[in-house]
UniProtKB/Swiss-Prot annotation:
Family to which the UniProt record says this protein belongs: Belongs to the eIF-3 subunit M family.
Lineage: Eukaryota, Fungi, Dikarya, Ascomycota, Pezizomycotina
Disordered: region residues: 387-434
HAMAP family: eIF3m
Any Gene Ontology biological process: formation of cytoplasmic translation initiation complex
Domain named PCI: residues: 179-350
Protein name: Eukaryotic translation initiation factor 3 subunit M
Database matches in Pfam families: PCI (PF01399)
GO molecular function, one term: translation initiation factor activity
UniProt subcellular location: Cytoplasm
Primary subcellular site in the record, as a coarse category: cytoplasm
Native organism: Neurospora crassa (strain ATCC 24698 / 74-OR23-1A / CBS 708.71 / DSM 1257 / FGSC 987)
Amino acid sequence: MATPQLIFVDGTFAELAQEMADFVQVGEQVQPLLEQDKREDALDLIVKASHSLNAAPEKDFTPAYNLLIHLVLQSEEPKKYLPTLCANLLKPITSSPTHGFTLASNALTTIFNLLDKSNPLRFNVFMQIVRFIRQNSQFDLLKPRLKNVEGWLQEWKSDSESQRKLYVEVSDAANDGGDQEESYFYLLKALATFDRDNQDEVASDEAQKLSLRALRMAISSPTRFDFNDLRSLPSVHALSDSHPVYSQLLDIFTEQDLEDYNDFRDEHQGWIENEKLDHEKLQRKMRLLTFASLAASTPNREIPYASIAKALQIPDEDVEMWTIDVIRSKLVEGRLSQKQKVFLVHRTTYRVFGEKQWRELGTRVDQFKTVVDRLVGVVRKAQTDVEAQREREQQELERKLANAGLGESEQRGGNRGGRTGGARQTRQRTDDDD
C-alpha cells in the first residue's frame, strides 16, 4: 500500500464539480444540474464518466482523482459512488503502463485514509485494495499492513461473514504471491469465524470447501509438521462426514507413521493421484514425521541405524542422509555416532500429546527418577566415606599429637633429673677434698 496522501482543494462544490465534469467531458450535462443544486445527480454523472480518467495523461491522473475523491466524500452517500471509483482503479491505467500500478495504488490508499477510522466503508475499500494487490502480484507491499487488520475489523464492527471474506481474500493474495505460510495462516483465521456451536454452519458447503483447502495445504506444505491447530477446528472435524478419506489422511499425518500411509494408499489405490496430490512429497513428509515419532518414543535416546532404516523403509546407507534432513526440518535435534551406528537424540518434537505420550512421559520420569536416586545414593555414600576418612584422619592426628606430647614430657623430666644429680655431686663432700 502506498503512503497516505492529503488532498488540498479550493473552491465550492459547484465550482469543483463543474471542473471535474469538464475534465471527463460531461460538463454540458452537469451544468444545469448544478444550477438547480442537484448535487447528487451531478455527481452521479461525473462518477459514471470517471472511467475516462484511466486514459488521462500521467501528470493529470493524481490531481484529477484527488479532486474526484474529494467530491465523492462530500456526498450524502459516498457508499453509492466508491465501488465505481475502486472498480475503475482496478482496471489498467492505459496512459501509463509503467507507473500505472503506483498511480492506482496511491489513489486507492488516499480513499482509504480519508475515510474516518471507524467508517465501515473502509472495509469495502480495503477489500478492493487486497484484490488490486493480488491481481498485480504485489503481496509483499500489503504484508506490513496486515498486523492492523484485526484492529480495523473491530473498529468497523465487521460481522463474522465479513471477516471471513476479508481473510479469504488475503489468503488468496498471499497464495498468488507465493507466501504459503501467510496464506495458510489467514485461511485458518477464516475458518475460525464459523460458529463452532452451530453444527449447520460448520458443516456448510463454504466451511467444508475452505476446510478441505486448508487440509490440502497443510499436508502438502514441505515445512508444516504440526496439524493440531487445523484439527482443532470444528469445520475440519466435520470433514469426517463430508470427506472421510481426506479426514483419514489427516489423521495419518497427525499421529501415525509411514506404514499407515502406505496401507492407506493400498486401501485407496489411485485416490492420491486422482486428487492431484503429490505422492512423492507426501511420502517424504511421512518419513520425516515417522522419524520424529521414533525419536520421541525411544526411552534410552539412542536409535540404532537399523531401527531408522526399518521405520523409514530405506536402505541402511541412506540413514545418515535422512537424519540430516530431519534435523534440518527442526523436528529432532541430536548427533550421529558413525562408530556405534546410532543416532543420539538430544531433543524431539511430539506430533501430538495424548494418553500415549503421557504414558511415555511417565515412563521417562520414572527412569529419570531411578537415575537420580542412584546418583543421590552414590553422592551420599561418597559423603559418608569422606566424613569417615576425615574422622579417621582426625583421630590419627590426635593420636600422633598425644604421643608426641608424652614423649616430650618424658624427655624434659629426664633432663631435669640429670642436672639436679650433677649439682648434688658438685656440692657433695668427699674424702679427697680433705
